[in-house]
């Protein structure tokens, strides 16, 4: 009898993880793109939210007390001034200097009903030498969740940063000085989610709106013979989903039915993504720590766009911003079209509250799909996450989905020289990287698959973070289009980001970060791109909120058809935190 109770308690705990927060589980049907690093498994490894198993019910009070003890509201507005020097250490390049004046705010909030983390910064640069002009820059990253009532949350996120405008162009890793191939991008998403226990059923629903905008600051300089491509403009994205499920108990298995709809409209070539699905899933516990998963459903997805307007020579016409002009007189053409049965099967293993593994294989998009996730927390200071994803995505949808996958609690960090937001963020509960999305502002829709790993840890006065991954994109363009030659082009990206920080004493600290990127370019005539960099910063508080910083960095870039670059940079600055 005792063994039966243990078995049922373990089975209920597994099922709670799969069925609790059912809105997230249904939404994950649209979240298997780059950057999430979790695919459909994201909800599987997440703690139960809004509804708990019998075991977690008994522990809920203890968790609530811990949350109250961890109540934190830390909002730090600041003013900053700095002097920057950059020098091209190869090829006899220029030495550039400029002064920065910045205002910003870093915030971490954790209360009973709200969680948020943000770093927002406005900066003006006064160019001084090397022909460098003045510039205004806005950058930031924010994630927040607000519980309006039990089970009903409003979530949102925003990103403002700079990235590579064209994956076939340079990747200096440092968007300062005379760098080319620079795009200013802005992305935001927001929406409500609802999780509710109705009798012995779990109900979930949600909606998300996303918007992404790109301004090309400095166009890419491409290798000889590489044709100039299109440039991303803006897109809007709507996602809605709902689900209803039941955990094992009355039945020897758990079940869930779900459905969703998504649409994205892009300004470029009147591009449109539209998808809908309905499916049923079952969870069959076979031991206190293992459950079998299975699902079957129907899905319809269409991606379409129009051709660019052609001049008398058959060359696409461009507007003043270098973007293709849409030929609205031509009919819409399909880039991708699927309509039919989808299925997947898998297993979930949860031997302890600190370890969980989910793996699935199935059929979607007319192809075999593999997804999964692994999470391991050996202690309260260390977390390792691994995600495998495969799905349809775009630059805009990838950014908003990647933002939604980031934690609401993280340490806001930036490049100490350029002030840009780091591509990877780390927190005590989870982390994430937007490196795949920021590698290339492609205008085409694509099939995205890959793997992402995150490690974050604290030991004594040290804190560490590592983000690494691989992302593969297969471009989807109408075969009958004048741009049809790039249909099926495969781009691959490998990335690594490492950061470490140490509090030296009560008044000073040291931070170090580095990155390594490799972009395997599949575009005709384009060459592969590799870049790497490392930076270090020392900060010391002199008086109350006044802090001085000294930083140095080294960035390297190499691509066939270009001179390799080695850029050294240094900064000295003062910040006053209010």
Residue ranges and their predicted role:
Residues 28-578:
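Gram-negative and organellar
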């Amino acid at each position: 009898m005792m063994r039966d109770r243990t078995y049922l308690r373990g089975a209920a705990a597994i099922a709670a993880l799969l069925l609790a927060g059912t809105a997230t589980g249904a939404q994950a049907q649209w979240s298997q793109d780059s950057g999430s690093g979790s695919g459909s498994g994201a909800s599987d490894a997440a703690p139960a939210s809004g509804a708990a198993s019998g075991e977690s019910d008994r522990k809920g009070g203890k968790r609530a007390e811990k949350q109250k003890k961890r109540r934190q509201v830390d909002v730090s507005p600041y003013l900053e001034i700095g002097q920057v020097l950059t020098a091209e250490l190869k090829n006899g390049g220029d030495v550039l200097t400029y002064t920065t004046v910045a205002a910003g705010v870093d915030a971490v909030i954790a209360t009973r009903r709200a969680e948020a983390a943000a770093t927002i910064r406005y900066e003006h640069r006064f160019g001084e030498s090397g022909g460098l002009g003045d510039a205004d820059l806005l950058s930031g990253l924010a994630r927040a969740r607000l519980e309006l009532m039990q089970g009903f949350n409003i979530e949102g996120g925003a990103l403002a940063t700079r990235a590579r405008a064209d994956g076939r162009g340079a990747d200096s890793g440092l968007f300062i000085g005379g760098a080319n191939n620079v795009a200013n991008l802005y992305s935001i998403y927001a929406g409500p989610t609802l999780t509710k226990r109705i009798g012995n059923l779990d109900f979930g629903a949600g909606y998300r709106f996303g918007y992404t905008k790109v301004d090309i600051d400095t166009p890419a300089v491409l290798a000889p013979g590489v044709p100039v491509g299109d440039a991303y403009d803006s897109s809007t994205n709507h996602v809605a989903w709902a689900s209803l499920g039941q955990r094992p108990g009355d039945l020897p298995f758990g079940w869930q039915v779900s459905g969703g709809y998504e649409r994205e409209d892009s300004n470029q070539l009147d591009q449109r993504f539209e998808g809908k699905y309905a499916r049923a899933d079952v969870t069959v516990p076979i031991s206190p720590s293992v459950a079998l998963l299975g699902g079957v459903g129907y899905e319809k997805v269409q991606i379409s766009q129009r051709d660019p307007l052609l001049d008398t020579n058959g060359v696409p016409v461009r507007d003043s911003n270098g973007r293709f002009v849409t030929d609205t007189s031509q009919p819409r053409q399909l880039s991708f079209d699927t309509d039919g049965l989808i299925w997947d099967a898998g297993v979930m293993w949860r031997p302890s509250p600190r370890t969980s593994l989910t793996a699935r294989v199935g059929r979607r998009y007319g192809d075999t799909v593999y997804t999964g996730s692994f999470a391991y927390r050996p202690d309260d200071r260390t977390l390792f996450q691994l995600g495998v994803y495969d799905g349809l995505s775009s630059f805009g949808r990838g950014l908003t989905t990647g933002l939604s996958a980031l934690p609401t609690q993280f340490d806001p960090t930036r490049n100490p020289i350029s002030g840009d937001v780091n591509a990877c963020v780390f927190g005590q509960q989870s982390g994430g990287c937007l490196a795949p999305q920021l590698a290339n502002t492609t205008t085409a829709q694509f099939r995205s698959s890959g793997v992402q790993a995150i490690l974050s840890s604290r030991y004594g006065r040290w804190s560490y973070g590592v983000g690494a991954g691989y992302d593969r994109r297969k471009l989807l363009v109408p075969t009958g289009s004048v741009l049809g030659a790039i249909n099926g082009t495969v781009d691959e990206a490998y990335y690594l980001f490492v950061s470490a920080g140490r509090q030296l004493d009560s008044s000073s600290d040291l931070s170090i970060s580095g990155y390594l990127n490799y972009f395997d370019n599949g575009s005709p005539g384009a060459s592969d791109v590799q870049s790497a960099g490392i930076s270090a910063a020392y900060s010391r508080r002199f008086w109350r909120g006044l802090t001085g910083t000294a930083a140095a960095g080294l960035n390297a870039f190499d691509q066939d058809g270009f001179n390799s670059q080695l850029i050294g940079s240094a900064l000295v600055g003062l910040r006053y935190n209010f």
